[in-house]
C-alpha cells in the first residue's frame, strides 16, 4: 500500500497538474482568439466572394464554381473538425481546470501511511514487549531457584548496561567526530572569508594610494600652472609697463618736437617780418641780403627736419599703440587659456577630492576588518599569497562556487539534522513511555512490598489467612515453588521466609530504581542533545542567512547573474527581517560622527538631507542653482563685453588722435609753407 501511494505521489508530481492547467488555460485563450480571427476571416472571405461574383463574368464564374464549391466543402469539413476538436478540448479543459492537485493530499497520505506504519511497528514492538513481559512473568512464576534467576537477571542487566554504554560511547564518538568536522569546516570558511577580505582591503589600499598619488600630481600640476600663470602675468605686466613707458617717452618727444616746431614757426614768422622790413628798405647792402637768404634757407632746412622727425615720432606712436593692442589681445587670449586650464584642473581636483571623499570609509572598513580578524582565526600565508596573485574576477568566481557548495552542504547537513532531530524525538517519546511503564511497575512493586511488610506474625489462624489473601498470586506461587509444599496451608509464613522474600523484593526494587534513574539520566541527556541540536540548527540557520548575504553581494557584482529558488527566497525574507550586526555598528559610528560635528556642519548636513528628501525642495534647489549659474555667466559675459568695448574705444580714440594729429600737422605744414612763399 505504501509503495502504491509513493508511486502515485511520484507520478502525480511528475505529471504536474498545475502546469498542465496553466498550459490548458493558455491554449484555451489562444483558441478563443483564433475563433475570433477565423470568424473575421470568414466574413472577409464571404465579402471577397461576393465581390468576385459581382466583378467576374458569368462564364468565368461557371468555370470556377466547382472549384469554389470543393474548396468550400473542404473548408466546411475542416471547420467542422476544428469545432469538434475545440469542443472536445473545451470539455476536457472544463473538467480539468477545476480539478485540485492531488500531490499535497498524496504527500499527506504518504506521511500518514508512514506514521501508520511507524505506529504499527510501535504496536508490534509493544506487543513483543508485552509478550516478553509475560514470558518474564511466566519465568518468574516457573523459576524454582531464585538465586539462579537473580544471577541471570543480573547478567542480562549487565549486558544491557554494557550495550547501552557501548551505544552511548559510539554516539559520543560520532558526535565528537561530527563536531570536529564542523569545526574544521567553519575554520576553513573563516580562513577563506578572511583571505577574501584581506585581498579586498589590499585592493582598497592600492586604490587609495593611486588616488592620493593622482591628487598629489594634480596639485603639483596646478601649483606649476599657477606659478607659470603668475610669471607670465608678471612678464606681461612688465612688458606692458615698458611699452607704456616708451609710449610716454614718444609722447614727450612728440610734444618737444611740437614745441620746437612752434618755436621754429615763430622764428620763421619773425624772419618773414624782418624780410618785409628789409624789403621796405631800398638801400640795403648786398651782404645783409645774403645773410637773410642764408638764414631763411637754414631755417627751412631745420623746419623740414623737424617735420620729418615729427612724422617719424607719429609713426612710432602708432606702431607702439598697435603693438600694445596686439599685446593686450595676446595677453587676454593667453589669460583666458590659462583660466580655462585652471578651471579644468580645479574641476579635476574637485572630482578627485569627491572620489577620495567617497572612499573616506577606508578607516572604517579597516577597523571592521580588524574586528573580523580578532573574531576569526589567522589564515595561512601561502594561501593568502596565492589568492592575492589571482585577479578579482577569479577570486569572486571561486568564492561564489565555494559559497554555493557550502550552501549545498549546509542544506544537506540541515536535512540530516532535521532527520536526527525527528529520530531523537521518537526516541524521547519511547523513553518517556518506557519510564512511565517502569514507574507504574515500581509503584506496583512498592505496593506489594508494603503489603508484605504489613504482614506480621499472626496470633490466630484466621488473621494469618486473612493477611495472606492480600499477597499477590505470582509472589505466592514463587514462594510456594521456592520453599516447597511442606509449608502448612493454614499456617503463617516463617520469619526467615518472609525476610528472604523481603530481601529479594527489596533488591529487585533497588535494581528497578537504579534502572529508572539511568533511564531518567538518558532522558535528560537526550533532552540536552535535542537542545544542542536545536541551537546548532539555529546557528546553521544564521550561517545560511550570512551565506545568503554573501551570495547577494556576489550577485550584485556586474556581469554575474544567477537564479533564485525557494530556499534563497526563504533566506532572503529572513535576511530582510534580520539585519547584520555590523549595520548597527555602522549606525552607531555614523551617529557618533554626527554628534562630533560642529553646529554649522550639523546644520549643513540637516539642510542637505531636507533638500534631498523632499521633491519640492530638490526642484527649488535645482532651479536656484541653475539661476545662480546663469547669473554668474551673464556677469562674466558683461565684464568681458565691457573690457572689449573699452579696448575698442581706446583703439578708436588712439586712431582718431593719430588721424587728427597727422591732419593738424599737415595743415600747419601747409600754412607754414604758404607763409614762407608769401
From Swiss-Prot:
The chain crosses the membrane at residues 620-640. It is found in: Golgi apparatus membrane. Residues 1-619 are cytoplasmic. Changing residue 609 to C: In a colorectal cancer sample; somatic mutation. Residues 641-678 are lumenal. It is a single-pass type IV membrane protein. One of its GO terms (cellular component) is Golgi membrane. It comes from the Eukaryota. GO terms for biological process: intra-Golgi vesicle-mediated transport. The modification Phosphoserine is found at residue 586. Its main location: Golgi. InterPro entries: CASP_C. This is Protein CASP. Homodimer; disulfide-linked. Interacts with GOLGA5. Residues 67-450, 502-556 form a coiled coil. Belongs to the CASP family. It holds the Pfam family CUX1_N. May be involved in intra-Golgi retrograde transport.
Amino acid at each position: 500500500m505504501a509503495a502504491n501511494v509513493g508511486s502515485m505521489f511520484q507520478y502525480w508530481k511528475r505529471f504536474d497538474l498545475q502546469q498542465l492547467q496553466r498550459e490548458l488555460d493558455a491554449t484555451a485563450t489562444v483558441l478563443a482568439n483564433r475563433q475570433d480571427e477565423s470568424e473575421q476571416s470568414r466574413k472577409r472571405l464571404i465579402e471577397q466572394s461576393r465581390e468576385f461574383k459581382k466583378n467576374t463574368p458569368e462564364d468565368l464564374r461557371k468555370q470556377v464554381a466547382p472549384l469554389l464549391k470543393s474548396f468550400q466543402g473542404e473548408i466546411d469539413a475542416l471547420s467542422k473538425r476544428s469545432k469538434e476538436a475545440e469542443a472536445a478540448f473545451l470539455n476536457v479543459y472544463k473538467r480539468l481546470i477545476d480539478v485540485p492537485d492531488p500531490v499535497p493530499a498524496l504527500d499527506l497520505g504518504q506521511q500518514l501511511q508512514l506514521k501508520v506504519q511507524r505506529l504499527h511497528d510501535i504496536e508490534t514492538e509493544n506487543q513483543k514487549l508485552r509478550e516478553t513481559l509475560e514470558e518474564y512473568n511466566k519465568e518468574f512464576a516457573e523459576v524454582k531457584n531464585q538465586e539462579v534467576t537473580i544471577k541471570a537477571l543480573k547478567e542480562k542487566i549487565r549486558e544491557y548496561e554494557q550495550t547501552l554504554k557501548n551505544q552511548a560511547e559510539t554516539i559520543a564518538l560520532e558526535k565528537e567526530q561530527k563536531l570536529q568536522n564542523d569545526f574544521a569546516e567553519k575554520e576553513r570558511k573563516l580562513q577563506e572569508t578572511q583571505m577574501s577580505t584581506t585581498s579586498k582591503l589590499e585592493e582598497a589600499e592600492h586604490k587609495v594610494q593611486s588616488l592620493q598619488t593622482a591628487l598629489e600630481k594634480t596639485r603639483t600640476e596646478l601649483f606649476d600652472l599657477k606659478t607659470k600663470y603668475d610669471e607670465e602675468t608678471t612678464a606681461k605686466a612688465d612688458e606692458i609697463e615698458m611699452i607704456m613707458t616708451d609710449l610716454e617717452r614718444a609722447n614727450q618727444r612728440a610734444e618737444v618736437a611740437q614745441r620746437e616746431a612752434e618755436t621754429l614757426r615763430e622764428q620763421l614768422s619773425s624772419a618773414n617780418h624782418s624780410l618785409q622790413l628789409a624789403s621796405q628798405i631800398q638801400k640795403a647792402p648786398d651782404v645783409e641780403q645774403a645773410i637773410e637768404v642764408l638764414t631763411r634757407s637754414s631755417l627751412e632746412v631745420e623746419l623740414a627736419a623737424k617735420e620729418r622727425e615729427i612724422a617719424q615720432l607719429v609713426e612710432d606712436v602708432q606702431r607702439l599703440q598697435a603693438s600694445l593692442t596686439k599685446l593686450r589681445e595676446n595677453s587676454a587670449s593667453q589669460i583666458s587659456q590659462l583660466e580655462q586650464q585652471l578651471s579644468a584642473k580645479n574641476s579635476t581636483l574637485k572630482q578627485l577630492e569627491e572620489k577620495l571623499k567617497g572612499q573616506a570609509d577606508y578607516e572604517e572598513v579597516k577597523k571592521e576588518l580588524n574586528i573580523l580578524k580578532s573574531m576569526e582565526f589567522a589564515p595561512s600565508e601561502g594561501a593568502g599569497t596565492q589568492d592575492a596573485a589571482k585577479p578579482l574576477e577569479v577570486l569572486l568566481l571561486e568564492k561564489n562556487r565555494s559559497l554555493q557548495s557550502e550552501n549545498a552542504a549546509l542544506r544537506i547537513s540541515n536535512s540530516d539534522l532535521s532527520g536526527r532531530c525527528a529520530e531523537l524525538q521518537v526516541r524521547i517519546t519511547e523513553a518517556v513511555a518506557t519510564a512511565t511503564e517502569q514507574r507504574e511497575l515500581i509503584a506496583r512493586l512498592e505496593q506489594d512490598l508494603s503489603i508484605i511488610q504489613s504482614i506480621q506474625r499472626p496470633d490466630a489462624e484466621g488473621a494469618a489467612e486473612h493477611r495472606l489473601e492480600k499477597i499477590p498470586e505470582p509472589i505466592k506461587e514463587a514462594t510456594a515453588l521456592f520453599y516447597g509444599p511442606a509449608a502448612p496451608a493454614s499456617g503463617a509464613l516463617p520469619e526467615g521466609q518472609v525476610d528472604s522474600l523481603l530481601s529479594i523484593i527489596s533488591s529487585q526494587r533497588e535494581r528497578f530504581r537504579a534502572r529508572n534513574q539511568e533511564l531518567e539520566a538518558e532522558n535528560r541527556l537526550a533532552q540536552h542533545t535535542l537542545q544542542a541540536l536545536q541551537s546548532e540548527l539555529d546557528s546553521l540557520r544564521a550561517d545560511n542567512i550570512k551565506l545568503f548575504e554573501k551570495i547577494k553581494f556576489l550577485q550584485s557584482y556586474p556581469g554575474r547573474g544567477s537564479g533564485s529558488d525557494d530556499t534563497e527566497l526563504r533566506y532572503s525574507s529572513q535576511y530582510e527581517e534580520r539585519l547584520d550586526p555590523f549595520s548597527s555598528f555602522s549606525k552607531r559610528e555614523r551617529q557618533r560622527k554626527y554628534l562630533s560635528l560642529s553646529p554649522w556642519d550639523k546644520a549643513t548636513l540637516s539642510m542637505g538631507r531636507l533638500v534631498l528628501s523632499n521633491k519640492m525642495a530638490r526642484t527649488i534647489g535645482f532651479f536656484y542653482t541653475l539661476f545662480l549659474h546663469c547669473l554668474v555667466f551673464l556677469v562674466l559675459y558683461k565684464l568681458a563685453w565691457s573690457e572689449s568695448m573699452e579696448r575698442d574705444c581706446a583703439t578708436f580714440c588712439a586712431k582718431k588722435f593719430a588721424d587728427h594729429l597727422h591732419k593738424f600737422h599737415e595743415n600747419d605744414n601747409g600754412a607754414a609753407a604758404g607763409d614762407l612763399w608769401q
